[in-house]
């Protein structure tokens, strides 16, 4: 047990350590975790012989439920509304068309029988939310015409549809006898009904129940995601559909702390993605992959250039979509973790040749991420679909700075240039707006242009928020008695090789905004700004 925990802990630390490095590479970071798993696997230097498909399917399905919940919860519905109809068409009928065409290719060209070919088509029919979100965010790809929102909604909502057809076809391929219309109806009705109901009920409870008091809302939401998946699944409904819809309903609700909850699930989802890709890399046997390389690449290329473009072109035609947008949406149909996890379901269900299906889907998913994921920014630029003025973060609910405004306070001391002047005069000297004047011995003043500022006033001012945070690094240091800051006036502090500015001092419970004459004492807490390297 201790060895297992030690291994898990070391792998998590290693993944988190290499993740920032991966963002500088020309391919999606998620590939690193697959490579790490393969290096530790049976054909790698570590020679870990891990072949428990059932355990992997359980762990990966659990991780996938949180990815799908977060995909719904973090979708900005207001931004997604204009593209919701085409996105839903792509995530439903698009899956059916893609699965059918791909299954036909597998049957006529690769020699699969019809059931196995359609099973393969269903497994790889959905676009992968984890991969799509990762590429969009890593490259901050804001796309014209709401294409980013379209891709996010489609990739977040099409996995449940692909899973549903995978479950049906895997049962048939394993020799099971099922009533297909009844099973599909049960999957959809229970999945959609319970997902919407759980999301609605959780939204009502989250502000009222004692379990959600004082910071426990995130844990409450964590439990809701589990229930939203487990209850429909237990009743033979579509748990993935339910958990996604519950996330959509909660994300659209006006609940306190939504941004903080989204940040928690963002971190949790990153861990889930790393877990899935690492386990899949650990589970695969690289020695078996060469025989699947040619059919896997052929299927990936066929989907990229034939089945996906046909599905996208047919379904977006009624909306008179720009051909460049159709081309980009077609290219952005990345296959990834969800497809490989669904292939595990076929293995566990006892489908003949299930291990070969897993290896084949693994090749398709990895090659899709490598080719489509790596080239997506370049393709978007070539098609002139990048919105240079946009910010893809606005399509997510964890985007906080919606009004672009921050509040600052200013103390008007003796000799301050604002003292004795009206706000009408001051307005021409600053881009900030005085929204409140706090004056000793008087009520707060809501000012107008005729308000005269007096010495001793505390002004609350609104200013545009600084957006380019990535270019500046802020750090807090304690001034030591023998450090280069102690005993120096700010203007006399030597800059050295890396210039910096002391933007704030904390001294004995007080906050000081310094100028060149400010004397720095040992024990001060200094907030220092430097240019990011």
Where in the sequence are the language-model features?
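Cytosolic regulatory regions of ion transport systems
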Residues: 310, 317-324, 328, 338, ...
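Transmembrane helical cores of multi-pass secondary ion antiporters/exchangers
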Residues: 1-389, 402
């Amino acid at each position: 047990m201790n060895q297992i925990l030690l291994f898990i802990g070391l792998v998590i630390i290693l993944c988190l350590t290499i993740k920032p490095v991966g963002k500088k590479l020309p391919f999606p970071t998620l590939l690193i975790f697959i490579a790490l798993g393969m290096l530790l696997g049976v054909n790698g230097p570590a020679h870990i012989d891990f072949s428990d498909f059932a355990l992997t399917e359980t762990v990966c399905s659990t991780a996938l439920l949180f990815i799908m919940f977060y995909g719904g919860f973090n979708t900005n519905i207001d931004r997604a509304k204009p593209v919701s109809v085409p996105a839903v068409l792509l995530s439903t009928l698009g899956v059916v068309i893609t699965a059918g065409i791909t299954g036909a290719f597998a049957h006529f060209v690769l020699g699969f029988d019809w059931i196995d070919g359609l099973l393969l088509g269903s497994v790889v029919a959905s676009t992968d939310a984890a991969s799509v979100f990762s590429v969009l965010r890593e490259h901050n790809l804001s796309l014209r015409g709401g294409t980013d929102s379209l891709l996010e909604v489609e990739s977040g909502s099409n996995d449940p549809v692909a899973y549903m057809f995978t479950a049906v076809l895997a049962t048939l391929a394993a020799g099971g006898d099922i009533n297909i219309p009844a099973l599909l109806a049960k999957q959809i009705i229970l999945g959609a009904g319970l997902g919407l109901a759980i999301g609605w009920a959780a939204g009502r409870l989250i502000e009222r129940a004692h379990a959600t008091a004082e910071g426990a809302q995130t844990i409450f939401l964590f439990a809701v995601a589990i229930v939203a998946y487990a209850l429909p699944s237990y009743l033979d409904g579509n748990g993935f559909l339910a958990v996604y819809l519950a996330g959509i309903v909660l994300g659209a609700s006006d609940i306190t702390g939504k941004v903080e909850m989204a940040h928690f699930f963002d971190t949790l989802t990153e861990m889930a993605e790393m877990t899935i890709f690492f386990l899949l890399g650990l589970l695969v046997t690289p020695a078996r992959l060469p025989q699947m390389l040619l059919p896997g690449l052929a299927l990936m290329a066929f989907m990229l250039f034939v089945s996906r473009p046909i599905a996208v072109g047919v379904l977006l035609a009624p909306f008179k979509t720009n051909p460049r947008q159709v081309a980009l949406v077609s290219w952005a149909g990345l296959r990834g973790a969800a497809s490989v996890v669904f292939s595990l379901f076929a293995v566990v269900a006892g489908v003949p040749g299930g291990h070969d299906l897993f290896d084949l889907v693994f090749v398709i998913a990895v090659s899709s991420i490598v080719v489509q994921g790596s080239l997506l920014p370049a393709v978007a630029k070539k098609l002139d679909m990048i919105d240079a003025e946009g910010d893809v973060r606005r399509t997510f609910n964890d985007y906080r700075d919606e009004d672009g405004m921050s509040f600052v306070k200013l103390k008007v001391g003796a000799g301050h240039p604002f003292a004795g002047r009206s706000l009408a005069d001051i307005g021409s000297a600053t881009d900030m707006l005085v929204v409140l004047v706090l004056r000793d011995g008087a009520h707060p003043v809501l000012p107008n242009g005729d308000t005269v500022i007096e010495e001793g006033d505390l002004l609350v001012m609104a200013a545009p928020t600084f957006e380019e945070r990535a270019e500046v690094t802020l750090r807090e240091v304690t001034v030591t008695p023998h450090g280069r800051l102690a005993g120096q006036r700010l203007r006399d502090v030597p800059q050295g090789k890396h210039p910096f500015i002391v933007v704030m001092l904390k001294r004995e419970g007080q906050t000081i905004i310094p100028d060149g004459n400010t004397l720095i004492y040992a024990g001060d807490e200094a907030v220092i700004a430097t240019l990011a390297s």
